[in-house]
Regions:
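C-terminal lobe and adjacent flexible extensions of AdoMet/dcAdoMet transferase-like proteins
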Residues: 191-234
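Conserved class I S-adenosyl-L-methionine
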Residues: 1-42, 55, 59, 76-79, 138-166
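Class I SAM-dependent methyltransferase SAM/SAH-binding core
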Residues: 47, 53-98
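A short acidic, Gly/Pro-enriched loop at the edge of an enzyme's catalytic core
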Residues: 99-110
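A short glycine-rich, Lys/Arg-flanked "PGG" loop and its adjoining helix->strand segment in the class I
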Residues: 123-138
Length: 234
């Protein structure tokens, strides 16, 4: 099997599984803000796209959702299984391919947290989400903030290059595409979604006691963008 480039395999998967548990960026900033946009999920069937090590899946389950969680990495799915056991349906799936495991109008909502910028076939993914979501369904999606990317990389704000970013462990890199706000909103609206809410996640107050420097930085410079998108109630 060819390993999808948008997944975190082997040591990279283990690295992110450990990092996501308590990271200022994940645990204290993106995750609470993104899941807040999902709202009341009790009794709802939710698709967790790019579920990683299962942190968002576990929270959705604890809130009473029925969850189908997918990821392209066997390594991360192993961590997700350790976290949620058999409480969720876990599937290995490359998000650059159609969601052929799901019938039309299967899910009440979907969560796609910090995954979108890794996907190449984004128009296809959005079309597939429109297909598998029920009428009036929702998609909660978070991604890197275009301003944060511009501040970090410099140059043109409109650069849409693919980036191979080196991590603190210099032997590990992740690949993603820089996307402008114009590109993001354009893709979502062109796919037929309507924008319900948009937030620039701030860190939880508890982070100040854990890492004051990161708390101050994340309170002043947005790292992520999160949206709640709706399908039509056809």
């Amino acid at each position: 099997m060819t390993l999808p480039e948008n997944a975190y395999h082997d040591r990279l998967g283990d690295y992110f599984a450990q990092l996501a548990g308590a990271s200022p960026y994940n645990a204290h900033t993106d995750r609470p803000a993104t899941l807040a946009l999902a709202g009341d999920v009790a009794g709802r069937h939710v698709l967790d796209l790019g579920c990683g090590a299962g942190h968002y899946t576990a929270d959705l389950l604890d809130r009473g959702a029925r969850v189908t969680a997918v990821d392209g990495s066997a390594t991360l799915l192993r961590h997700a299984r350790d976290r949620v056991g058999d409480r969720a349906e876990l599937r290995r799936h490359d998000l650059d391919t159609p969601l052929d495991f799901a019938a039309d109008a299967t899910y009440d909502g979907a969560v796609c947290a910090l995954v979108y910028h890794h996907v190449t076939a984004r128009a296809q993914l959005l079309a597939e989400l429109r297909r598998v979501l029920r009428p009036g369904g929702w998609l909660v999606l978070s991604t890197t903030h275009p301003t944060a990317e511009w501040l970090h990389h410099g140059g043109s704000n409109f650069d849409d290059a693919w980036v191979d970013a080196r991590l603190p462990d210099p032997s590990l890199t992740i690949r993603y595409q820089r996307l402008t706000l114009e590109a993001l909103l354009g893709e979502w609206l062109a796919a037929g979604f309507t924008l319900d809410r948009l937030v620039e996640p701030r860190p939880l107050p508890q982070l100040r006691d854990v890492d004051e420097a990161r708390y101050e930085k994340l309170s002043q410079e947005p790292s992520f963008l999160a949206v709640r998108l709706l399908t039509s109630a056809r």
